[in-house]
Amino acid sequence: MSLDNYDKDKFVVLVCAGPSARFVKKTDEYYTAGVNVTPNLIEETDFWVVNDGCYLVDLSDEKLLKINNIALPQFPHTVNGVDYRPTVGLDYLAITKYLPSNIKIHPFNIHTAPKFNMPYNTDLPYFDVRSSSESCFKWLLHKGFTKFISLGHDPSGGYHSSQYSRPTKEGGRVMITAPIDNPRYHIVHQRMRSVIKEAGASWIRAVLPPDSSFDEEMFNKIKDHALDETGYAEVTL
């Protein structure tokens, strides 16, 4: 599915699940991206990216109507109810067939496809990733976007009060609100910074006041912030 009608020069505002996540309002000045269940913090989501199929049942019918695109592995994780391993009979077509028609579907592949001998399509984009946020960056970069602002990407871990995870070792059956793998977030952060640096892209990690939301006014305060030599900046308002 082509994204040719999107302006690749626009920023993409990515909402992650960390404590600094904030509600993002719709505006024509930027696109929005969510991972796992963070579309619940976005007025209208342009790009929803998941590695784990278990999250597809977690958004309301009303929220799904406010999502324009979903990108996910050809063989998603956490679909068999036992563990995170992808399953041949539960590919992206099987788990997305219940989504409303307004959501355009974009498959890619990740490192677990060959690891578990999945019959994956080598013509699809292929990424080595360790998180849905990293998948989001890599997929959007592959599609031509290069300017990013993130909310809720917290290297020290934790979840926003509205967010949760479904541990892959439990097959997605258990919902938790206290992360059990906080040290991993530092690794994920460094991987994502490397992705941006290698692509020659830009990433502003924003931290807003607790009761605020992200809108066009906030965007204009942040978008021109100076970047370091790797294309990265952190802004606290």
Identify the role of each PLM range.
Residues 1-237:
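Metal-ion/cofactor- or nucleotide/acyl-coenzyme-handling active-site neighborhoods
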